[in-house]
C-alpha cells in the first residue's frame, strides 16, 4: 500500500523565500506514444493533454504536466482519500495499461512536492541549474525538467 504520510511538518521562512512541503497528494506517471493514448488520457481525466514542451493543463481537480513527448505527470490539486486515489489509478490502468496503450504508475509515495515562494525564486533556481528561467517568469503553468549538479529534479512547475 502506498504511504501518504510525510516526515516534514515544518515551513521555513527566510527574508525573501518561504519553503514548505505540499501535503501528500495523488501523483501518477503516465507513459505512451500513440495518438490513442493521448486521446484516452484526455477523455478519462476530462483534461486536455499537453503535447507541447514545457506546458501543462488542469481542471478543477487535476493537473497534467508534459515531461517528454511520451511522458506526463498527473497530480491532484488537493489531498484525496485513498479510496478515490485507488479508483482513479485503477480506471487509468484499465483504460490504458490493460489495453496496451501505455503505462500507468502511481508514484505518490516516491516523489515529494515542495512549494517555493518569494521574490528571489528564479535567482535561487538559476544559481545551480543551466536552464534559462527568464522565459518562464511571466508564464503561468510552465514546466521543465531540470538537473542540479548531482541532483535531478523531475519537474519544476511555475504557477
Regions found by a protein language model. Name each.
Residues 18-37, 107-128:
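Short glycine-/aliphatic-rich beta-strand segments at the starts of folded cytosolic domains
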Residues 41-56, 122-147:
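Internal amphipathic helical hairpin motif
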Residues 42-73, 80-96:
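A glycine-rich, hydrophobic loop/mini-helix early in the fold
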Residues 77-82, 119-121:
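Helix N-cap motif at beta-to-alpha junctions
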Residues 99-108:
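Conserved short beta-strand edge segments in small beta-sheet-based binding/regulatory domains
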Residues 149-155:
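Conserved small/polar residues in nucleotide/adenosyl-binding loops
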